[in-house]
Regions:
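Cytosolic catalytic domains that perform sulfur/thiol-centered chemistry
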Residues: 21-23, 84
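Bacterial N-terminal signal peptides that target proteins for export
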Residues: 1-11
Length: 129
């Protein structure tokens, strides 16, 4: 009976003594899902023309062509850095030929950062201006 307790205490002690930066190495997938790792970057000039126009509209405060532009983006999959609810807002980037809003969006963060997704929230790239 004392062996399991001793083993458990050893594991607990080892975990407490590990530097916190080593813990990120142990679980990189969890760190990535939590938005800990930096998002890939896309330069403003590399964005599709419609995305550059949408970003200009966001910075001007509108008017926006889609009713759902400006709604809260929940970041439920945690592909962006984790923030409090309401921190992120989403805006539609028109997709030529699409009959609906399409898959492209710009997500605006509360501190002035912007992210582009061309695949309906599967991947994000931070916009570098």
């Amino acid at each position: 009976m004392s062996a399991p307790r001793s083993f458990g205490a050893t594991i607990l002690l080892a975990a407490l003594l590990l530097p916190s930066n080593l813990l990120a190495v142990v679980a990189p997938d969890q760190a990535r899902r939590g938005g800990v790792e930096e998002s890939p970057v896309i330069r403003f000039e590399e964005l599709p023309r419609e995305a550059r126009e949408t970003l200009a509209l966001i910075k001007r405060g509108g008017p926006f062509p889609y009713k759902r532009d400006g709604i809260v983006f929940g970041n439920r999959e945690r592909r962006l850095p984790v923030q409090s609810n309401g921190y992120y807002r989403e805006y539609t980037v028109p997709t030529p030929g699409a009959r609906d809003r399409g898959a492209r969006r710009i997500i605006a963060g509360g501190s002035g950062e912007y992210y582009y997704t061309g695949d309906h929230y599967n991947t994000f790239r931070r916009i570098r201006e």
